[in-house]
């Protein structure tokens, strides 16, 4: 009896051992399959950046993890990297890497002329128009569509270049005009003094305004002050002689009867003197000489600056001459009363 249980125990042990072995073998086969399925996933992590356009590689990876055999639409290729190691990547069979490159479409002159005419008419040709145009030119609709896309891109680039060129040309023209104006302003001489002078510019006034110099300015200042004092004295002198001498220089400038003051004034003034701005020339000469003597011009200044300053002083003295005459009269009256 004890032998039978021993045989049964051996059988049970053998059955359990066989079950264990089969279970271990099944587990090992599963681990091997899992390792085979996870191996391409590790390899696909790096090259997916280079082949990001093939979205079917993810499907291949999923199907590979589920089954040990590759699906029909996936294939394996071996790639050697820069370090020399060989890597296995899975790519979809639809991605034909061995196919030749697409040849560029060559249009005839007639086709280009017709396409250009249609583009000038309308930049977007779609629908029946594109179908009819492709049929007439013996082209495909895709070729016509791509040609119009390229033509629109070229036009945009040309317009951008033209706008940049126009801006550069306008800036250059503006700069040149500004430089030309500055050059003209630098070379422009001050306004001519002979145009401002009366016909009697050959007298003492013209010589004083044309050729300024320090000794001449000093002499003119002395003569002007003496003439102004004499004119004031003649204006304040009582009697018909004073009245005649007061109005006589403004009319003709000829010497008339009166005291020595007016006679000396007419002797020092030119015989043919004309009025400027309805004012007597001797009084104008005196005011100009006094203003020039109050602020003498230096010889170190440029000739253009001196002429411009002289013209400005000449105009200012002419404008304010009546006020200076009244001031001289008031001063002379005060001196006479004292």
Curated annotation (Swiss-Prot):
Belongs to the EMX homeobox family. Its main location: nucleus. Residues 1-34, 327-338 have a biased composition (Basic and acidic residues). Residues 239-252 have a biased composition (Low complexity). PROSITE patterns: HOMEOBOX_1, HOMEOBOX_2. SMART domains: HOX. Transcription factor that may function in dorsoventral specification of the forebrain. Required for axon guidance and major tract formation in the developing forebrain. May contribute to the differentiation of the neuroretina, pigmented epithelium and optic stalk. InterPro entries: EMX-VAX-Noto_Homeobox_TFs (IPR050877), HD (IPR001356), Homeobox_CS (IPR017970), Homeodomain-like_sf (IPR009057), HTH_motif (IPR000047). It holds the Pfam family Homeodomain. It comes from the Eukaryota. GO terms for molecular function: chromatin DNA binding; DNA-binding transcription factor activity; DNA-binding transcription repressor activity, RNA polymerase II-specific; RNA polymerase II intronic transcription regulatory region sequence-specific DNA binding. Residues 100-159 bind DNA. One of its GO terms (cellular component) is nucleus. It is found in: Nucleus. This is Ventral anterior homeobox 1. Keywords: Developmental protein, DNA-binding, Homeobox, Nucleus, Transcription, Transcription regulation. GO terms for biological process: astrocyte differentiation; axon guidance; brain development; camera-type eye development; central nervous system development; glial cell differentiation; negative regulation of neuroblast proliferation; negative regulation of transcription by RNA polymerase II. Residues 1-69, 239-269, 318-338 are annotated as: Disordered.
């Amino acid at each position: 009896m004890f032998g039978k249980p021993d045989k049964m125990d051996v059988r049970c042990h053998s059955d359990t051992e066989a079950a264990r072995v089969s279970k271990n073998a099944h587990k090992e086969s599963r681990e091997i399959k899992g390792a085979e399925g996870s191996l391409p996933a590790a390899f696909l992590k790096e090259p997916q950046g280079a082949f990001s356009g093939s979205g079917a590689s993810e499907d291949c990876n999923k199907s590979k993890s589920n089954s040990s055999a590759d699906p029909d639409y996936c294939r394996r290729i071996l790639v050697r990297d820069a370090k020399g190691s060989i890597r296995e990547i899975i790519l979809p069979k639809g991605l034909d890497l061995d196919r030749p490159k697409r040849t560029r479409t060559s249009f005839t002159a007639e086709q280009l002329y017709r396409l250009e005419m249609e583009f000038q008419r309308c930049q977007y040709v779609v629908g029946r128009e594109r179908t009819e145009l492709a049929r007439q030119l013996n082209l495909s609709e895709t070729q016509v569509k791509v040609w119009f896309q390229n033509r629109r891109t070229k036009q945009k680039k040309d317009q951008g270049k033209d706008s940049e060129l126009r801006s550069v040309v306008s800036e250059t023209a503006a700069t040149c005009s500004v430089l030309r104006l500055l050059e003209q302003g630098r070379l422009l001489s001050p306004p001519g003094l002979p145009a401002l002078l009366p016909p009697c510019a050959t007298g003492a006034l013209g010589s004083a305004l044309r050729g300024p110099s320090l000794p001449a300015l000093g002499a003119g200042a002395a003569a002007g002050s003496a003439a102004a004092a004499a004119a004031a004295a003649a204006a304040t002198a009582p009697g018909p002689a004073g009245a005649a001498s007061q109005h006589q220089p403004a009319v003709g400038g000829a010497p008339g009867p009166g005291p020595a003051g007016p006679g000396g004034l007419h002797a020092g003034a030119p015989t043919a003197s004309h009025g400027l701005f309805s004012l007597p020339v001797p009084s104008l000469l005196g005011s100009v000489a006094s203003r020039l003597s109050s602020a003498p011009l230096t010889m170190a200044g440029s000739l253009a600056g001196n002429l411009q300053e002289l013209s400005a002083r000449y105009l200012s003295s002419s404008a304010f001459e009546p006020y200076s005459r009244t001031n001289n009269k008031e001063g002379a009256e005060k001196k006479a009363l004292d």
